[in-house]
Curated annotation (Swiss-Prot):
CDD domains registered for this protein in UniProt: CIMS_C_terminal_like (cd03311), CIMS_N_terminal_like (cd03312)
Binding site for L-methionine: 436-438, 489, 604
Name of this protein: 5-methyltetrahydropteroyltriglutamate--homocysteine methyltransferase
Active site: 699 (proton donor)
Catalytic activity: 5-methyltetrahydropteroyltri-L-glutamate + L-homocysteine = tetrahydropteroyltri-L-glutamate + L-methionine
InterPro entries assigned to the protein according to its UniProt record, in alphabetical order: Cbl-indep_Met_Synth_N (IPR013215), Cobalamin-indep_Met_synthase (IPR006276), Met_Synth_C/arc (IPR002629), UROD/MetE-like_sf (IPR038071)
Entry-linked NCBIfam families: met_syn_B12ind, PRK05222.1
GO BP terms in the entry: methionine biosynthetic process; methylation
Family stated for the protein in its record: Belongs to the vitamin-B12 independent methionine synthase family.
């Protein structure tokens, strides 16, 4: 039977109900039972939405309190010893403590590391494996959710992260050892999970093995056959799910594994289909991921249907239809958007619409095109409208792109010359202290922004309130003793949305939220057309901030690669072309800041690494245009203007040459959660410019001690000469509260002062 299904659904709710419930619980304003009830109601609603849209199977286990990888750590009993001994099951507060470093009723402890989920803007909590790691069933959450869905009579397909991907995504702690050596101990527990699902009456289980789209070492490839052969008996039928890219040289391996079904991503890698079909066995089900799970563009139903009709000829009823990946990366429901203009809205589809597209494709295939004729006609009209719209292409932007030359990608002189000029002009001390940019977004700030957008206060009053917040941030930083100040970004709701709102070619949603990590949600803008800057975007705020202090204030911009990566990007031209348009816009803004006497300008690129293709063979091309775009944005200034950049959550030891090629005068990086591991890159590669390794983890409310910060700086000094070291947090302080910010920054400044006088 041809089946319409889904790999995963957004968790947060149409009105971010999960976010508000979690944060109330963490503040002890909501009890645990009330939190559990909120999440139970959300799950039931989401299952109902998917079933009513026409799906034959709805996912269970895709919902998470915080993160699906952390869920697997809890399920399998992978709890680091510092969180205490787990007697029976991992309780909810231990779970939150692993993610955040604190939870109601728990003492503060270092949180587990957090990093990017493949090449997305979602973050997962990294499993920590000990050399003699024991595994056992330590959570009933998945089984309870299965029972919930069954009690409501939903047709279900539980979702698990596969054993090889779970090990691959974790880190060895303690002594260095091969994570793969843990597989034999892990597999019996997976077997228990599958057996228990079988006893619950589950017919199909989805096992996600996204690492099959990566370059895998031979021993990991060999482990797949061993692992899945051991899981053949005693469980439900297994659908092996891959996404975010092509199987490539893992195609034969994936096709021949002893499982009953295979899901492939035909949006990010449509070219892989022919090779998969060549290797595909006659007994196996193929799930075709034809609806884009990561972007917001409406599906071309005619094109997808033509592909499915050809597949049905080959596979008959062994064909399933699905989004390309989990809809975790998509906003919830386009119906919640009332402010988008109708033309643009007709080009879009969010999670609810995407499952409707999946169901429509299945109905067309099974019942005939006539049954869904209106849906097909609407889809065709939307495709034609988008191709023909005059709002997408701007001739003057196309002309400027052709004028970009190599001189526009180079500073006037190399770093050693620039550094001497900057030392003379900026007169900064050894171990200069600064922050990454944002300060706490208080309820008053958020209210002022809401009131201004809603028209409840006029622009002069809004500006007065924002200037008061800027003054507060400047005064606070002066009192802490920081050397280079920032204006605090009170006027910015989001580091991408703020800029996009001032650029033509961008559109914005009211409720297009997607989960970044835990309760943290982002609302990516939509880049639908050529990008144009109407006027300076940050100059007035920075000029005001600089007028309040004799110390230097850093300008703060979001870089072209990050603007690209953290937006929903048009798919009608190469991403490199869109990035160049963004770089040209930022080049103009950087020069305007310099003209306004802002002599330190930070161009943030926290998403630089996440743009990397998953296959290494494709890295060179990406890095070439990403570096070029950054340099176009940042190279139009005088030697005395110091260009900073910032990267967070980045493991970029293997792209350190590209990082150096950015030629930023100063780079600040995240190192605190990973115990400074990132600095090992500098043992083999002497980074030529200045660097600020983050000395405390802003994502955890735990404040470090002065001794801890001194230790991190001393460790950094083993790789970087002291005269090229900066002292800073590892990320912006937007999500923190002022009391903890004050304590942490005073401690950080004290550590720097102590080292100067040592």
């Amino acid at each position: 039977m041809i089946v319409a299904h889904n790999l995963g659904f957004p968790r947060i709710g149409g009105q971010r109900e999960l976010k508000w419930a979690l944060e109330s619980y963490w503040k002890e304003q909501l009890g645990q039972q009330e939190l559990i009830q909120v999440t139970r109601e959300l799950r039931a609603l989401h299952w109902k939405q998917q079933q009513e849209a026409g799906l034959d199977l709805v996912p269970v286990g895709d919902f998470s309190w915080y993160d699906q990888v952390l869920d697997m750590s809890a399920l399998l009993g992978v709890v680091p010893p510092r969180f205490g001994e787990i007697q029976d099951e991992v309780d909810l507060d231990t779970y939150f403590c692993m993610a955040r470093g604190r939870a109601p009723g728990k003492k503060e402890v270092a949180a587990c590391e957090m990093t990017k989920w493949f090449n997305t803007n979602y973050h997962y909590i990294v499993p920590e494996f000990q050399p003699q790691q024991a595994f056992r069933l330590a959570s009933s959450t998945l089984f309870n959710q299965v029972a919930e869905a069954q009690a409501l009579d939903f047709p279900i397909k539980p979702v698990l992260l596969g054993p090889l991907s779970f090990l691959w995504l974790g880190k060895s702690k303690g002594s260095t050892f091969d994570k793969l050596s843990l597989l034999d101990a892990l597999l019996p527990v997976y077997g228990q999970v599958l057996h228990r699902l079988k006893t619950q009456g589950v017919e199909w289980v989805q096992i996600d093995e996204p690492i099959l789209v990566l370059d895998l070492p031979p021993d990991w490839k060999a482990a797949f056959e061993r692992a899945y052969s051991s899981l053949v008996n005693g469980g439900p039928k297994r659908l092996l799910a891959t996404y975010f890219g092509a199987l490539g040289d893992n195609t034969r391996l994936a096709c021949q594994l002893p499982v009953e079904g295979l899901h492939i991503d035909l949006v990010s890698a449509p070219e892989q289909l022919a090779k998969v079909l060549d290797e595909f066995p006659s007994y196996k089900i193929l799930s075709a991921g034809l609806v884009d799970g990561r972007n917001i563009w409406r599906n071309d139903l005619e094109a997808s249907l033509a592909q499915l009709e050809a597949l049905r000829e080959r596979l008959d009823d062994r064909l399933w239809i699905a989004p390309s990946c989990s809809l975790l990366h998509s906003p919830m429901d386009l119906a919640l958007e009332s402010a988008l203009d109708e033309e643009l809205k007709s080009w879009l589809a969010f999670a609810v619409q995407k499952i409707e597209e999946v169901a429509t494709l299945k109905r067309a295939l099974v019942e005939g095109r006539d049954v869904v004729a209106q849906a097909l006609a609407d889809s065709a009209a939307a495709q034609a409208s988008r191709r023909q719209s005059e709002r997408i292409y701007r001739p003057e932007i196309r002309a400027r792109m052709t004028e970009v030359n190599e001189d526009m990608t180079r500073r006037r002189h190399k770093y050693p010359v620039r550094a001497q000029v900057q030392r003379e002009e900026l007169k900064l001390p050894l171990y200069p202290t600064t922050t990454i940019g944002s300060f706490p977004q208080t309820p008053d700030i958020r209210k002022a922004r809401r009131d201004f957008k809603a028209g409840r206060i006029a622009e002069p009053e809004y500006r007065r309130q924002m200037e008061a917040e800027i003054a507060r941030a400047i005064q606070a930083q002066e009192s802490y003793g920081l050397d280079v100040l920032v204006h605090g970004e009170a006027e910015r709701n989001d580091m991408v949305e703020y800029f996009g709102e001032q650029l033509e070619g961008f559109a914005f949603t009211q409720n297009g939220w997607v989960q970044s990590y835990g309760s943290r949600c982002v609302k990516p803008p939509i880049i639908y057309g050529d990008v144009v800057r109407r006027q300076p975007m940050t100059v007035a705020w920075l000029r005001y901030a600089q007028s309040l202090t004799s110390r230097r204030v850093k300008g703060m911009l979001t870089g072209p690669v990050t603007l690209l990566q953290w937006s929903f990007v048009r798919d009608d031209q190469p991403r490199a072309d869109t990035c160049l348009q963004l770089a040209l816009v930022l080049r103009d803004e950087v020069r305007d800041l310099e003209q306004a006497d802002i002599k330190l300008i930070q161009v943030d690129e926290p998403a630089f690494r996440e743009g990397l293709p998953l296959r290494r063979v494709e890295w060179e091309s990406y890095l070439a245009w990403a570096v070029r775009c950054f340099r176009v944005a940042s190279s139009g200034v005088e030697d005395g203007t110091q260009i900073h950049t910032h990267m967070c959550y980045s493991e970029f030891n293997d792209i350190i040459h590209a990082i150096a090629a950015l030629d930023a005068d100063v780079i600040t990086i995240e190192t605190s959660r990973s115990d400074g591991e990132l600095l090992a890159a500098f043992a083999a590669f002497e980074y030529p410019n200045e660097i600020g390794p983050g000395v405390y983890d802003i994502h955890s409310p735990v404040v470090p001690t002065e001794a801890q910060i001194v230790g991190l700086i001393k460790k950094a000094a083993e790789y970087i000469p002291a005269e090229r070291l900066w002292v800073n947090p590892d990320c912006g302080l937007k999500t923190r509260a002022w009391p903890e910010v004050e304590t942490a920054l005073r401690t950080m400044v004290a550590a720097a002062h102590g080292l100067r006088s040592a």
